[in-house]
Amino acid sequence: MNKSSFGSHFTVTTWGESHGKALGAVIDGCPAGLSLSEEDIQKFLDRRKPGQSRYTTARKEGDLVEILSGVFEGKTTGTPISLMVRNTDQRSRDYGNIAYSYRPGHADYTFDAKYGFRDYRGGGRSSGRETIGRVASGAVASKLLASLGISFCTYTKSIGPVSIENFSPEEINNNAFYMPDADAAAKAGTYLEKCMKNQDSAGGVIECRITGVPAGLGNPVFEKLDAMLSQAVMSIGAVKAVEIGDGIHVAHMNGSEDNDGFTIKDNMINKTSNHAGGIMGGISDGSEIILRAYVKPTPSISQPQQTVTSQGRQISLEIHGRHDPVIVPRAVVVVESMCALAITDALFANMTSRLDKIQKIYSK
């Protein structure tokens, strides 16, 4: 089965290719009555669209969203919401030299192995432009969650060897890298200039902090909340690893260091630390959820690379076209969107976890 849908209760299906006529998504399960406009969605899409700085692809796309269904007089109707963004600046001719070549770091070979056929123009469904549907849907989920007091703070934690040393939330939108540290952003720019001069690319780390999530979301076995979030974020093409809370560092800690203690504050149960990152036993504990996504370097580089063709010839390949030297800044909102979709789906699933919750919904 070709899986292009995410979620069980708040379901999103993305469609379209990088060089097709359009891309988009269909959302099924959004409740009626949510105030929603194209402007709400456009704010999210503008954070990932190309051409925002010299460190992103020169492809000029407005990425203007159209709501085709599911909204009437500014409110969601409870029926499927169809969202579309038209492609306007494709240059398929840039990909003529790779029609039969397997680009290192791309999905060309694996698509051929699976389907026996592939759309080589920009990678088709494996292109980063597929995330347009995710981001548009994530904007809807984020607005719904905001109405429930759940918010996100997502930013670039590092690019290549350059990591943030300070955290100023107001700085995130003041630089091209969405870094909460102006000094680190300047150093990242210098590092990327060297990468570009060497016809190379860079990766990095994105951190997402989610506040306001109530205790109780997720399940104890196969649909753990951390597993749902990890699946959501790992489904992003450039992401190679995800960690929650202290992540891989817990392997080097003692139990006395890793365990989060509990205390009572204002008649509420609180934790004295948050090494678990807001999730214990697969279930949210009410504290801030902290997730990090590790993003690989952009595989499209201009350096000659050794590869083979689908006919079995060994060749040296130079990739031309318009490509990002680093995808991390544009992926920040993609990570946030996928987290929003996962939290929304878990929230809806949790509405039937207890009889008293069902009785509260249907009380006369």
Residue ranges and their predicted role:
Residues 1-59:
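N-terminal, positively charged regions that mediate nucleic acid binding
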Residues 11-16, 119-130, 215-219, 274-279, ...:
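A short glycine/serine-rich beta->alpha loop
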Residues 15, 21, 199-202, 206-314:
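Glycine-rich anion/phosphate-binding loop at the beta-strand->alpha-helix junction
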Residues 21-33, 128-150, 223, 227-231, ...:
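Alpha-helical support elements that line or immediately flank enzyme active sites
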Residues 44-104, 108:
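Glycine-rich, N-terminal phosphate-binding loop and its surrounding beta-alpha-beta segment
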Residues 99-124, 305-323:
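Short acidic, glycine/tyrosine-flanked loop/strand segments centered on an H-E-D-like triad
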Residues 113-221:
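Glycine-rich, mobile lid/loop segments that gate access to catalytic sites or pores
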Residues 300-364:
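Internal helix-turn-beta structural module
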